[in-house]
Structure formats: structure tokens, C-alpha cells
Design a protein with these regions (language model features):
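Surface-exposed extracellular loop regions of Gram-negative outer-membrane beta-barrel proteins
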Residues: 18-35, 48, 118-133, 160-169, 171, 183, 216-221, 230, ...
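Flexible loop and strand-edge segments within Gram-negative outer membrane beta-barrel domains
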Residues: 30-49, 56-119, 125-143
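Outer-membrane beta-barrel translocator/receptor signature
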Residues: 1-36, 44-51, 62
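Hydrophobic, lipid-facing positions within transmembrane beta-strands of outer-membrane proteins
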Residues: 6-10, 49-53, 69, 101-107, ...
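Membrane-embedded beta-barrel scaffold of Gram-negative outer-membrane proteins
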Residues: 19, 118-132, 231, 239, ...
Length: 347
């Protein structure tokens, strides 16, 4: 690549009657890169290996199972160029080392009872180990998280109903390298949801949903959402949507990562609370073609607004430490995005 990088990947897929498989593997490397000659890395040096095999079992015409594994190993080193080149001294001594392992399993089960009814189960388990090092400080920890979902789908001519249950778990154990307070945590979230897709008319489709999550120590979150798709002409359409969301507090934020989590106090369940978000978006899409369909043109314009209540911010304390506090008030973000696409035949 132009940034002194190398990307190599391979893919294989095959089906043998009732058994199928796909295998994806990649290797990514970046050499130390300092295009402005500042003496510090603009892109750190790293090596990354990814391996992703999947197995598909077609048990019957109506029942399928898939099992997958995703493994990733990465070593990353940034900081002073001379240090990275092995020429470090008292002047050239700053570095940031990241050693990461992320492994996850994926399991899906689907069974169709008839043309209208279907049962699905999904499960994923993720193991994430990280070691961060800077001069005179190191952070190590292991995070194990799981996600499970059971859903039932019923389809009619113009409507589709989906109802289900969710279970999330998230456990973090810090490798205690100093006498600083441990930042270990263990979270479990139970959820139930129902959603409906309705083809109201030829020009209007409505998608509505309601999710309720119970988060121990933080209470219940009720999360409605709605989306309406308007087909104004054969070439011009629009979508209007909105919904609620939330995030549980953890020490893993962008601000705390910039400090390598050094001197960041653990989350206090008695003081912290859920960050709650409220969003609204609208987009307009125009599609046309020229030259007997050989040339296609599309443009999409998106506008969005997000309101975040009681945001979690990193604040310094009087004794030189840092605490993540839910501040009183809100932050909001708004903006737009334009995408233009021109295609020629299959390009």
C-alpha cells in the first residue's frame, strides 16, 4: 500500500451435498511509517494474522446449522522512530506496544416449519486478550463476552412479525500488575423484543419495533424504534427513522484508551448510570440509468441527529487520578452524508 503496508488474503468455499465450508485467511503488515519526518509514527508497525473457517450443515430441506471460528493475532508497535529501529536511548525512548488476541465462535440454527413460520437461534462467544505497554506502565486484561438470541418469525402476505429473547454477558478480569484498584467487572443483560414489518401500500413500508432490556445495577431500558420507507417514484425514494438506545458504563472509552487506562478509577455502580441516546435520521435516494442500462447513477443524501443524555466523560480528580462520570445534561451531534455512485455494467 502507499503507507508501507502489505495485505495478503485467501478464500476457499465448497459444498458437498449436505455439508459446506468456507475458509478465509489473511496477513496484514505495516512497516514503520513517518511521511512528515516528525520522528514519530503516523502509522505504527504491526503484524496481523486472521483465520476464519466456517462449517455449514444442511440437515434437512428446512433445517440448517452453521458453526464458525474467527481467530486474530496482532502485534503493534508505535512511538519514536529511533526506538522502533532499535536505536533507542534516553532521548528516543517513547513507545506504545499493543499485543492483542481476539477469538470468537459463531453458531446459528434455523428451522422453517412451513412457508410462514421460522425458528432461529444465534450464539457467539468472544475471548479478547490485550497487553498495552508504554514506558514505566503496562495494562493487561482478558475480556470474555457472550451473546445468545432465540427468535420466532411469522410471515403473512403483507406483514412479518418477529419476537425473541436475548442474553448478553460481559466479564473482564485485569491482570493486576500494580497495587492500583482493580477494574474487573461482570455484566449480564436480559432482553426481549418484538418487531413488525408492514407493507402498508405500494408506496409505504413501515418497520416498528420494541425492545426491553434489564441491566442489573442500572435498571430497565425500554427501546422503541420506527422506520418508514416512502417510494415516491420508481427512481426516487426516502426513508425516515428514529429510535432509542443505551450503553452500559465501562472503563473502555476513547478518552481512557488515550491514557492506556493509567490512573483511571473503576466504574462505581452506585454513582454511574446508563448513557441513553435518542436518534432521528432521514435520507433521500435517487437511482437512474443511461445507455440502455449499461451506465447506472445513484445519489443518496442522509441527515441525522443524535441526543445523548447523561454522557460518560473522563474527568480528573484532585489527587491526580481519573474518574468516568455521567455528567448532568446532554451532548448532541448532527450532520449529513452524501454518497454518489456511478457504475458501468459490472463495474
Amino acid at each position: 500500500t502507499s503507507g508501507k503496508g502489505l495485505d495478503v488474503s485467501g478464500f476457499y468455499g465448497q459444498r458437498f451435498n449436505k455439508v459446506g465450508t468456507t475458509i478465509f485467511a489473511s496477513y496484514n503488515r505495516n512497516w514503520v511509517y513517518d511521511p512528515s519526518d516528525t520522528g514519530f509514527t503516523a502509522i505504527p508497525q504491526f503484524d496481523r494474522y486472521v483465520f476464519n473457517p466456517k462449517l455449514f450443515l444442511y440437515l434437512t430441506e428446512h433445517t440448517q446449522i452453521s458453526i464458525g471460528l474467527n481467530a486474530m493475532f496482532e502485534d503493534r508497535l508505535g512511538g519514536d522512530i529511533e526506538y522502533i529501529k532499535g536505536k533507542g536511548d534516553d532521548t528516543h525512548s517513547y513507545f506504545e506496544k499493543n499485543k492483542t488476541q481476539r477469538h470468537s465462535t459463531q453458531l446459528t440454527f434455523g428451522h422453517r416449519f412451513n412457508e410462514k413460520d421460522r425458528l432461529d437461534f444465534k450464539n457467539s462467544v468472544t475471548y479478547f486478550k490485550r497487553n498495552i505497554g508504554v514506558p514505566s506502565y503496562s495494562f493487561e486484561g482478558v475480556q470474555v463476552s457472550t451473546f445468545s438470541e432465540l427468535s420466532y418469525t411469522h410471515t403473512n402476505q403483507k406483514t412479518e412479525w418477529v419476537a425473541g429473547l436475548n442474553l448478553w454477558t460481559d466479564k473482564f478480569d485485569e491482570n493486576k500488575l500494580t497495587d492500583f484498584q482493580p477494574r474487573d467487572y461482570n455484566q449480564t443483560i436480559l432482553g426481549a423484543f418484538v418487531q413488525n414489518n408492514w407493507e402498508a401500500t405500494e408506496w409505504l413500508n413501515l418497520e416498528t419495533g420494541l425492545r426491553t432490556d434489564y441491566v442489573p445495577d442500572y435498571g430497565t431500558a425500554i427501546l422503541p424504534r420506527v422506520s418508514a420507507h416512502f417510494k415516491i417514484t420508481d427512481n426516487f425514494s426516502s426513508r425516515l427513522g428514529g429510535g432509542f438506545g443505551y450503553k452500559t458504563p465501562t472503563i473502555f472509552t476513547e478518552d481512557s484508551e488515550r491514557l492506556q487506562y493509567q490512573h483511571v478509577l473503576p466504574i462505581d455502580k452506585d454513582k454511574n448510570k446508563l448513557e441513553r441516546s435518542y436518534g432521528l435520521n432521514i435520507d433521500f435516494n435517487y437511482v437512474t440509468s443511461f445507455c440502455d442500462g449499461n451506465i447506472t447513477f445513484s445519489i443518496n443524501q442522509l441527515f441525522f441527529y443524535t441526543y445523548l443524555d447523561n454522557p460518560l466523560l473522563l474527568q480528573s480528580t484532585t489527587d491526580g487520578l481519573y474518574r468516568l462520570n455521567n455528567i448532568t445534561g446532554h451532548t448532541d451531534s448532527k450532520g449529513g452524508e452524501t454518497n454518489v455512485k456511478i457504475g458501468y455494467k459490472d463495474f
